[in-house]
Amino acid sequence: MNWKQPKVYAVRHKDEATRAASRSGGIFTALSDQVLSNGGVVYGCVLTDEFDAVHIRTDNEEDRNRMRGSKYIQSKLGDTFISVKTDLDAKRSVLFSGTSCQVAGLKKYIGKEYDNLFCVDIVCHGVPSKKIWKAYLRWQEQKMHSKVASVDFRNKKDFGWHDHVETLCFENGKSTSSQVFKELFYGHTVLRPSCYECPYKSVIHPGDITIADYWGIEKAAPEFDDNKGVSLVLVNNEAGEKIFEKVKKRLIWKQTKLEDSMQPPLKAPFSKPDNREQFWSDFENKSFEYVAKKYGGIGLKNDAKLLLRKIKRKIKKLVVKGGKRDSNII
């Protein structure tokens, strides 16, 4: 049974390469490494070659690494729940990661408590329509005269952790960085209708542990913020506490206050925007270029901001030398 109030932590993985490959601080890698090292299996979301989000099962680090990073689209579960139950009944340790509604759905499907099941859910803003994502990709391909080869929903390497910039690489060797999909996503017009009534937009979540980017870290634990990524960890019950204790050896961590960690999705669902119907009318009847300009913030001003951010970050990398902490607890 989950506690009425979670225990809250700021977390960074000790291994800098792991943190660099993660979208925030690397907590998912630490948790999944614990399960894999004991012969367990991990279920999580990956991008296919067609840039669809799907849940897969893995017992190895290579496929697990594909699960790292943000995917701002809804994953297809397929027969994942059936597979999870099969593993549980075979006494395999299972880590399932997903949105809160996916975790709740899994628990309802399996129908009883399993000591060998560990669930991680994410602090979720909501999930957008697949139509928007596919239209965005087609628009970028038309602009670049090439098929998309890879997608980074949040390019931490070039723009840092604080900024949300998507980067697409193309088969012709070119790349482009943009905030169009980010602007559409955070404008909330593209979300599924059920997301506006989500019962999990609070501090109470169905997972054993809930994870997120630690937005607000400058208040909760400013010494953690080096713009390379910090994970927010909510430990929701005894099972979550047990595994978190086991992975602490892989982490630099600090217990923080819940009141300093309250992101909007931990308070209430986002309201349905007043312009949602107009957005969808525009999307169905206008070009995506029109939609991107009206709702996605494109233009010379935005392009200049992105270029300036990239230049500043490259300069900072040249003049700042980072140091390693000796302490695991801050």
PLM feature spans:
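Glycine-rich phosphate-binding "P-loop"
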Residues: V54-I82
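Electropositive, gly/pro-rich neighborhoods at or near active sites that engage anionic ligands
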Residues: M1-I27, S32-Q34, I311
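Short, surface-exposed basic-aromatic patches at helix termini and helix-loop junctions that form
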Residues: K107-F118, L137-Q142
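Gly/Ser/Thr-rich loops at beta-strand to alpha-helix junctions
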Residues: S24-G26, D49, F96-L106, G126-P128
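Short, flexible loop segments at boundaries between secondary-structure elements
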Residues: F118-W139
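Non-heme iron-sulfur electron-transfer modules
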Residues: M1-E16, E50-T58, R64, G216, ...
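Long, compositionally biased charged/polar accessory segments in the mid-to-C-terminal portions
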Residues: N38-V41, S146-I330
